[in-house]
Amino acid sequence: MPPIYERIEQDLIVQERTLWTALTSADPPPELERLSHPDAIWLFPKKDITDVESLPQTFADKFHHFESYDLEDVRVIVIDLMAGTITYRIRATHGKKQYVATGATTWGQGSDGEWRIISHQQTLQ
């Protein structure tokens, strides 16, 4: 694997952790909007398909407010120099409640050099 691909892999892992820090915060939408491509799509369990404009409504019930989370079995696919997908298993807790799901996020890098979410999906296990 070329060294640039290794750097892209590491960048995407850092971005995914930034995403999950935002997802588990008290007010996710502002940071999620910043991280997202304008046409990004979000697929959460038991929620309608969400776009950037509907993030505030999707998070109104605080369904994703976890105290802790851990990403396991992280795999990165570098699509090209400006795009990649990361998949993993997520384990999160809220009080005594456990949340276990698989996750996948596709990231694209804009002309400004910033990574933006193109799509994000979680599937309950």
Task: Give the residues covered by each predicted segment.
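A beta-strand edge to alpha-helix "cap/lid" segment located at domain peripheries
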Residues: P2-E33, I41-Q125
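ATP/adenylate-binding site constellation spanning eukaryotic-like Ser/Thr protein kinases
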Residues: H37
